Amino acid sequence: MAKIVAIYASPRRKGNTASLLQQAVAGAREAGADVEEIVLRDLKISPCLEIYGCAKTGKCAIKDDFGLVLEKIEKADGLLIASPVFFYAVSAHLKILMDRCQSLWVKKNWVDKAPSTKNPAARKALFISVGATKGRKLFDGIMLSMRYFLDVLDATLFKTLLYRGMDFEGDVQKHPEYLTEAKAAGYELGRILAGGKIDA
């Protein structure tokens, strides 16, 4: 059974990104995947202190919930990640997780001095993001960060769902087609990871 980790990076429990991710999770489970949900706002994860306690081992020296999250990510075949846009970047919750994954970069490039043994093609990620404005470059910064974050996680971007013009909690409910699209994307990821074909 394919294992997927779903990461909720919004500070709101019932926000638009959370609602979309819930649909993606439902779709992945419908496809037969084992999905574990992680709500970053509920965890105690310190920002990176740049003390390079990871320099010799590739393991972060800070003792908090990051270690548990990383362990789950490393065991996953797929990732579902959702974050709102804050100042043309990801939420603070996700940015902290990204920065703490510097220890992975250190492990790969300083300690092992070789790429991870994990096949990058095997771990796939679906990324969902919602922004309030309708600017053409709204997602440029966030996608650049995600590209390099997923590279550190030895993951490839399977699909992105980017939605503009939603700011207040519940706005996504006015767009049922977005929720349907998110569920379909989660289902598709689950099927692909399970080695199955997508239903027509």
Feature-to-residue mapping (PLM):
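A broad detector of the eukaryotic-type serine/threonine protein kinase catalytic domain
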Residues: 9, 130-133, 166
